[in-house]
Amino acid sequence: WLTGLFLALLALFMMTGARAFLAWPMYESLLSTLPLYGFLALGLTLVVAAGEMDLCFPSTLAVAGFGFALTGIHTGQVWLGVIVAILIGLGIGLCNGFLVAYVGVPSIIATIGTQFFWRGAVMLLSQGLALGLADLGGSPMHSVLAGRLGGFLPMQSLWLIVMALALWLLLNRHPLGDAIRFTGEQADIASRLGINVPAARLGVHTLMGGIAGFAGAIGCMEMGSWWPTQGDGYMLLVFAAVFIGG
């Protein structure tokens, strides 16, 4: 019924505000910005499926974006910056997963703490200053990840579809997906069935970090800059996408 309500409202807006709602630039704007939330929501879905929580991803996105920006500025290589951003995200996610799976800190507490730590760290390292990345806009990798297909369709919207399909297959057609869901539903029984519960928890947090790192790089490429508060305000919308959108 939510889909029906959305379509009804969209039809109403199109009839009453045709100049705005029938113009492609508005939808191009949506398709260029909403994938960032979508990437994060996909990663968080796996974390929640494992019975865990991650509140660190906005800060992970900012730190990874900072790594992407510095790498791009100093080397001029967008592809290398993307790799650095993903590796930074994986590292932060690995730390979160280790705290949760092997130290025994509840995930909500662990990731709240690491969120503040990494946000403070990136503020300190950047001295609160933004970084301009306009010179990276013409590279082939930029065109592949955040360019415009046919001059109008944002590439990140296509990458969101690719990631959604890949993670759906992982969760529903792969033994790792079974381990994640069993861990989330009943960890004790999953352990008795031979599932490595700590490894499953470590894996989802690490993957969430890597996805946040990728989103950080995409965000920098789309905006043409990095800013210290990157990721602020994302948490509520991402949680809404996961828990309300299902």
Which residues make up each language-model segment?
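Hydrophobic alpha-helical transmembrane segments
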Residues: T3-G4, L30, Y37-G38, S59-V63, ...
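Hydrophobic core of alpha-helical transmembrane segments in multi-pass integral membrane proteins
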Residues: G4-T16, L160-L167
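Single transmembrane alpha-helix segments in multi-pass membrane proteins
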Residues: A8-H74, F98-V105, F243-G246
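Small-residue-rich segments of transmembrane alpha-helices in multi-pass membrane proteins
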Residues: L36-Y37, G65-F66, G113-V122, R192-G194
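Hydrophobic alpha-helical transmembrane segments of polytopic membrane proteins
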Residues: G43-L44, A85-G93, L165, L236-G246
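Helix-loop-helix "hairpin" substructures at the membrane interface of multi-pass membrane proteins
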Residues: Q77-A85, G91-N96, L149-W226
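Transmembrane helix-bundle core of multi-pass membrane transporters
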Residues: V103, S107-H174, A200-G203, E222-G231
